[in-house]
Design a protein with these regions (language model features):
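Conserved Class I SAM-dependent methyltransferase catalytic core
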Residues: 209-268
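C-terminal beta-strand of the catalytic ATP-binding
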Residues: 183, 268-270
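Mobile active-site "lid"/loop adjacent to the S-adenosyl-L-methionine
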Residues: 183-214
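Non-catalytic accessory regions of SAM-dependent methyltransferases
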Residues: 1-41, 46
């Protein structure tokens, strides 16, 4: 079987299983199986697919058809033009979270705290894009292992701390606190795609029945590690409800994404 034929058959299997973006997914999985990029696939379309490549490709196709996210199969996800390692222990970084990174970069903070770092995508990106001192926390030891791996692989200097929110950190030591907390409402669970609902870590997705449980803790807790005049930035689910929680903060603003959806809340510590 040639590379071209394998790619076509993979696409057809994925389409039959109603997997979205079947062609792209087949390409990504075949690239993973053979260890070459997309340009190689098309330059060597008439090459015979060796047996070990076909075995790997077949296994990856089966995993995807069974609902495993492509990113967990390949172990990779691009974020802010860099490739991050991801596993089922961490949430898959989304493109919309780059709006949070952009908002943080615009502040030029000297010391940044990322609460609930997960894969480390936000913290590592901020460390690489700035000269800031970056600290990141997470309660999950498995997530911290992935985050440390990503920092090391990408050459970022980030201090990782195992704790709940910012509990283990010194008061008033940061100019900026960023967070992408779990904000999917438990009542909306059934509306999620199965590959998200059933495969990504629930603790990183769901913020209680109304999606606001972590915000209720995070908004008051973020005051402590922030210096006076420091900034809190959070990715949003329910913008109106979270804005109301920040009534005691100054300079509250909402940043919309390109689709006009409220995506980031910014608030200044008095």
């Amino acid at each position: 079987m040639t590379v071209r034929t394998a790619l076509l058959q993979g696409q057809q299997l994925l389409e039959k299983a109603s997997v979205s973006e079947a062609r792209l997914t087949a390409e990504v999985l075949l690239m993973r199986a053979i260890g070459h990029d997309r340009a190689w696939l098309y330059a060597h379309g008439n090459d015979e697919l060796i047996e070990v490549w076909w075995i790997h490709f077949g296994r990856y196709l089966h995993q995807r058809i069974q609902g495993e996210p492509t990113q967990y199969i390949t172990g990779r996800q691009e974020f802010y033009a860099r490739e991050f390692r991801v596993t089922p222990d961490v949430l898959i970084p989304r493109p919309e979270t780059e709006h949070l990174v952009e908002a943080a970069l615009a502040r030029g903070a000297e010391a940044i705290l990322d609460i609930g770092t997960g894969s480390g995508a936000i913290a590592v990106t901020l460390a690489l894009e700035t000269k800031s001192r970056v600290t990141a926390t997470d309660l999950s030891p498995a997530a911290l292992r992935i985050a440390r791996h990503n920092a090391q692989a990408l050459g970022a200097r980030v201090d990782f701390v195992a704790c709940d929110l910012g509990a283990a950190l010194v008061d008033g030591s940061f100019d900026l606190v960023v967070s992408n907390p779990p904000y999917v409402a438990g009542r909306d669970r059934d509306s999620l795609q199965p590959e998200v609902r059933d495969r990504e870590p629930a603790f990183a997705l769901f913020g209680g029945e109304d999606g606001l449980a972590i915000y209720r803790r995070l908004v008051p807790e973020a005051r402590r590690p922030l210096r006076p005049g420091g900034w809190l930035m959070m990715e949003l689910g329910d913008a109106r409800a979270v804005r109301e929680m920040c009534a005691g903060w100054g300079g509250v603003e909402i940043v919309n994404d390109l689709a006009g959806i409220p995506r980031v809340l910014i608030a200044k510590k008095p």
